[in-house]
Every structure is written in structure tokens, then in C-alpha cells.
């Protein structure tokens, strides 16, 4: 789990997301509180419940991006799910308990990687022996073996091809659910897993270079040194205490005034979410998982519905409300220039692969921001996503002709932007240009 302070978390999010300081602060404090709780006395630790967050704001202002960046920062089991993908228990589809099962799988992956790192040195030694076996055979004399070991460590044999046996992760025989059995998807029957255990772990022969073989062999040897029981126990503990669930599009399951039908099922999903957010025990194939201390961050645009359309009990379980504001021209300008992987930087890098140098003047960036603001206000406000539409339109000709213009430099100014997107800004009825 991350030990970043709230200020450091906000500063890290600032590298990718412009503005929305309130939302960043809320998630930073929530993340830090996870760490603070771990430092408490065990008797008090169980009493400290996470303060779940509801993020409200128009589309394209950074709600989902905050969750993506938070996942990388968290250093804890983190899963982002769309609320619209789940159905009420009793209907065909995935029920909300699957969220926790998926979260445990994420936890298993995290703990396994950590354990692999701990035994990597031992695994590397074993992997080297297996490479030598493949190169000189198991019956070679110690002198020959040492001679090849020296060459191997000096990198002289990196490109030599060898045959190695590695664990077969499964042949794509997926799992299936047993119809008509309640809770059947606790451990969706995974055929490859069952057969693998029955046959004592299958292996497959792979032909690869010496250099490329190391990653597979080290992973293979690491897994032999790791106790799966310990991994499962630690993953369940980590999920229960540090797990974070990001529920996107929660406004889509809010019951709207008037009209029944689909609304009944939407309300059913909310009812199913209640015990999960409040604290319940979910059965998984790794054992029962308590959700009392899992942090839930919900977000929605609430264009059609309002937060008050959610069930009152669910509203009560999301005590921290954060509003994200719509983006203005200055925000668009900063998104184009200041973020770590800004659109302008991406397009420059793409064109450099064709040996084409792309430059944007300051007034071109202003013009791009102007067009995006105008389209958002006159057509539909889709936030920062509008910039992708505008940029694609501006660079359409350049992208198409780039292979023929290699070795040249192109400077884009305000006049060029207006020439290529002027019609887009004026004829808002031309639906082919509107995202």
C-alpha cells in the first residue's frame, strides 16, 4: 500500500489531470486514511470505517482518469467497474458480488508479484541451470558446464535458440457457470485449472532465444518457491483491509422519475449494492471476504438523473460528495500542453516515426481550445474528449500524407487550425464531424 502523503498524491495526479482540486483532495485523503488505519491499535482499527466518496460532474472532466491514475498509485487491490454491467440477482447477467471476486483476483496478482520479487535471486540461479541444461545437456562435464556458464554470463550466447519446458498456463478452455444454481459463479468452473491440478501441472515445450527464455524460466522457478496458501491468505487480508472499488457510471442505475420497466432492474442493482457497501461477507474460491473495510468511490455525470434519485440508503453510504466543475478554455489549453502525455506530445511522437517534425504555435493552441469550447457549448458538452475530435480533424491531411513528407517540418498556426476546423465550428448540424 502507498505511503504517499495527501499532498504527494495530489501532486502525482496533477501530472495527468488538470484542475478538479477538490476531487483530488478527497481521494488523496481517503487513500491516506487507509494507511492511517493500519497504524492503529487492532481494537480500534476494526471500528474505523472507510468514508466512501461520490464524485459528481459532467462527462469528460476527469472522473474516470482520476480512477485510472489512482489504481497505479494505490499499491493495493484496486478495481474499476461500470455499474451498468451488473444486473439484479435473479436476472441473467453478472451480480454485484462478482466485483469482490474480481478484486480478490487483483489482490492475488499483486501478492504473487511481490513474492516473486522476494525469491527472484534464487529463481535466477535455478533458471541459469536450466538454460545450461538446454545448451549442453545434463550429462556434460563440470568443466564444459563452467565454460558455457562464463559465455552465458558474458552475453555471448544471448541469440542462440534453445528448447525449454515451461508451465502451461492453460489452453484457453475458459470457465462456465452452472445455470439455475444460486451462487454458482462463486468459483466459475475453470476446466483448465481443474485438469492442471489433476495432472500435476502441465508443461509445454517452447523454442526461444537464451535471452528471451530467462523471463519465462524465472517466473516458473519463482512459482515453485512460493507457497500458494500464503499468497491466498495475504491476498484476502489485503483485499479486506486495503481494497478499493471504483464504481463508474453510477448515475445510469439511478431510477428516473416516471416510467417503470428497466427502472425496476436498475433499482435492484442499487439494492444489491447496499450490503456490499455497508459490509457483508462474499464467498470466493479463495474463501470468504468481508467488505466492511473496502473503500468505494462512486462517480457519475448525473445528466438525466440526480444524486437524490439514488436510493436514500445508498446515498447515506456515500457520505463524501465532491463536485467536479466543467472545463473552460484555459483548462483546455493546459490539457494540450501541461499534462504528462498531452495530446500534442502524442501527435508529435507519432509523426516523428515518419521523420516528420510537428510544431504548434501558441496561437494554434489557443485556436484549438477555442474551437473545443465553442463545440461543447453549441452541440453537446463532452468535456476534454472534444479535443480528440478537433485534433484529429486538424491533423487529418498531415497524418494521411506523412509517409510522403518524411524529413520535413510542419508548423501549425491559428490560421491552419481555423482553415481545417472552421466548418466544424460553424456548421454544427453536420453530424459526420460531431462525436
UniProtKB/Swiss-Prot annotation:
Keywords: ATP-binding, Chaperone, Cytoplasm, Nucleotide-binding, Stress response. Its main location: cytoplasm. It is found in: Cytoplasm. One of its GO terms (biological process) is protein unfolding. Transmembrane segments: none annotated. SMART domains: AAA, ClpB_D2-small. CDD domains: RecA-like_HslU. It comes from the Bacteria. InterPro entries: AAA+_ATPase (IPR003593), ATP-dep_Clp_protease_ClpX (IPR050052), ATPase_AAA_core (IPR003959), Clp_ATPase_C (IPR019489), HslU (IPR004491), P-loop_NTPase (IPR027417). One of its GO terms (cellular component) is HslUV protease complex. GO terms for molecular function: ATP binding; ATP hydrolysis activity; peptidase activity; proteasome-activating activity. ATP binds at residues 18, 60-65, 248, 313, 385. A double ring-shaped homohexamer of HslV is capped on each side by a ring-shaped HslU homohexamer. The assembly of the HslU/HslV complex is dependent on binding of ATP. ATPase subunit of a proteasome-like degradation complex; this subunit has chaperone activity. The binding of ATP and its subsequent hydrolysis by HslU are essential for unfolding of protein substrates subsequently hydrolyzed by HslV. HslU recognizes the N-terminal part of its protein substrates and unfolds these before they are guided to HslV for hydrolysis. Belongs to the ClpX chaperone family. HslU subfamily. This is ATP-dependent protease ATPase subunit HslU. It comes from Rhizobium johnstonii (strain DSM 114642 / LMG 32736 / 3841).
